[in-house]
Amino acid sequence: MFSITYVSLVKRAPGDRRGPRRFWSKIMKLAIRSAGAPPWRRVHNLLAVAATVFATTALPAQVVFHVSLGQASPTSVSGRLLVFAKPLGPADKRPVAAVNMDQIDTHATAIAAQEVAHLKPGATVELDADVTAFPTPFSHLKPGHYAVQAVLDRDHSYNYTGRGPGDLVSGVVEMDLPGDTAQLLTLATAIPEADPLQPLSNVPAALKEVYATAKADIHPIDFTSPALSRFWGRPVALRGWVVTPPDYAAHPGQRYPTVYYTQGFGGSLRSLHDVAVARWDEMKTGKAPSMIWVGVDQSSPTGTSEFVNSVNNGPWGQALTAELIPDLERQYRMDAKPSGRLLTGHSSGGWAVLWLQVTYPKLFGGAWPTSPDPSDFRDFLGINLYAPNANVYRKPDGTPWPLARDKGEMLVAVEDYSRREVVVGEYGGQYASFEWVFSPRGAGGLPVPMFDRTTGTVDPAVIAYWKEHYDVAELLRRHWPELKRDLDGKIHLTVGSADTFYLDGSAHLLEATMKGLGARTDFRYVEGRGHFDLYTMGDDLWGLYKAIAWEMYALARPGSKSPPVSAPPPPAPAR
């Protein structure tokens, strides 16, 4: 009773001392009433006092941050306010430039969040770091010295892009947590727009030197889609880059095979440009054949579109195949026939090109997906979504489902990744992105969640919808007779046998399905490779990309000869 009373008293406004005084007054009155009481009553009362004192010392202090809008914006702003806190040790470098979440180590940085509406310049908002936080309420953080930074995610894109243009950030403040939150966090800096023509920081120095030379052959795509614009009620554009070969201008009568590629989750228009420069340089140096490469950005505020005609994201497949491709074939000297329309992509981009090949088999001549997202939902990142009482957080034995691994060891659990995603924002994260593509639309206009974010329990009705519409293996089983003529032999899939996100499991199931249908299959499992080192062949970090390019060219130009390059990995034995 006393601990409950104490909790209710200390939740008064800061500076209100009536609660503690009233509390200790009650303790004293209880002690006085105990005088002269029977021994058992005195013991009972003293135990109650001891329990109350224990409660007062055990309860952690509430952590509230004060965040103000400085000179970063002359007008009021809204968005998702995020506060990041990372523990600092004696060996950590000072000063700390920025505090961000770690994509793999979910517990490396604590995050608290809340929505902010119409915050005016000079105004201050309080963020209670115990209400919406990961991995724990801030009052339960391990006591220590922390680097803290506030970010206002104005377009709610942090789950996908991290901090980006237009977001407002504070300086990094060092403080002791939990408890020491007296220092004001001021949103003083606006992140500027990034130049998509400038290389990202992780681009090799040798490739950066190529940018100026390649510029003339890399052309921006900014195509307003009628179909997507009708769906959203506002102009929506497909963006990307067309890479013409270095010899394009010198051969005005020549047509070229065309490769359509897209990025994985987290990719952007800017990262696609880096890929465009790399492809141009490979053609310039003779390491890859002369083809037109079209990089189409599939990122959106909700995640990746996967070029699916989705009830939530809109008709992205239609926009690409019926609108953009015909427009590009009018502008550039492309083959404009199935054998000259080829597809490749990695991870979520791999799933997208696999889907496009299966859905539009007459339009495209072949797809080379690498490490595609799950194509058979009986193995969705290792989890059978169709199993009775399926749960994405816990296995039947109660142990956590892993999301990522390295050398057989779990790097991050699905539950941790999902819970953090919810704190950072409502959409744009990986699991929310899957739902915006695959799920039915709910009564409130948002996708119906595939699983309960609190318990991890899978919704069988939602999974039934996923199976009916987007399980590639299931679609092949149902429609192979009508697909066989235009699709057979066109899928060339490569994945590491130790894929970081367990995507090799789904690939094995898809291959087994296709073999069971009598389809010609080309599945390759690179022994020991994960998600991020799959393309390395010998000393060449992009060797697999070049090998795939020559395979595509051989399909488009039968009889052509490729230079001596390392052969793509052979198919692994069936398991």
Segments and roles (model prediction):
Residues N45-T57:
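Bacterial N-terminal signal peptides
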Residues P60-A61:
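Boundary at the C-terminal end of the N-terminal hydrophobic targeting segment
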Residues P87-R575:
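Non-catalytic cap/lid and distal C-terminal segments of serine-dependent acyl enzymes
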